[in-house]
């Protein structure tokens, strides 16, 4: 009888310990190895009207399921880059006073050509093509 009780207690404790370990490991594994989300077959998006974005400013637009940083460099020049930092996939933002792209996660900076200026990002941002169609701004994938 005492032996059966010990076995039951051992079984319950090992089951509880296993459940505790799995409840900790599951979110860690999901974070480290996220599910692959199929990329939407989008080749271009209408990003808004020319007059919606003043010179020396930027906004983030959706390109399928990915964010793209659209920058109006001056009256006539436009740039667009992936808004995903090449270091750890944080969302980047445009710093108007410095005229640079900044990743707040680890203080990485990119210039207006998407090239790394400082910080930990290992490679430049992916660039997109910007075209004007009348008063509409259109962002297209590089081929």
Give residue ranges: language-model regions:
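Twin-arginine (Tat) signal peptide motif
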Residues: 1-9
